[in-house]
Amino acid sequence: MNKPFNDDPVEVLVKKFLSRNGTVLDLRLKYIGDEGLEYLAKCPELIDLEVLNLGRNEITDKGVRALAGSSIITNLKELHLEKNEISDAGAKAIAGSANFSYLNFINLWKNKVGAEGAKAIASSTILVNLKSLDLAQNNIGDEGAKALAESNTLAGLELLEIFGSGLTDEGKKQL
């Protein structure tokens, strides 16, 4: 695992960066990878976690599946996963896990989510509280944009970022 800005093990990072009340953990640019996220998913200190920032951590679908299956991290309101390696399978794991039923903010900017991942988010019966969704610089294309535009789940969405995600002019009109 490449750790250019971090030499600490994830256990130490939790102690350093978990807010005093235990609701916010900011580990952006710590390069914890899937192994680190698997540790977080089992970490009892994170029982009250509401905001998790894992931007730029070399996380793949494997790590997202661990988070989706966590019996500890079940109350997240904000999930930052920008600039990782998450594909449709990771988006589907988020869309299908009751752990994310309180989410009002998801940042998946600059990952590898395609139309199937966008469709999974759009059709999720779990992500009903979502207010902000960032799928910019992925590859959702017109098909994914259409699913997002027609979604009943995302009816309360206030912000949708999808620039640089492979939409044609026709796809943009759907939104």
Predicted region positions:
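Intrinsically disordered, low-complexity repeat tracts enriched in Pro/Ser/Thr
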Residues: 30, 43, 73, 104-106, ...
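Short, solvent-exposed loop/turn at the beta-strand->alpha-helix junction
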Residues: 5-10, 30-38, 58-65, 85-92, ...
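Concave beta-strand-loop units of leucine-rich repeat
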Residues: 25-32, 53-58, 81-85, 96-99, ...
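C-terminal capping segment of individual leucine-rich repeats
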Residues: 18, 42-45, 69-72, 96-99, ...
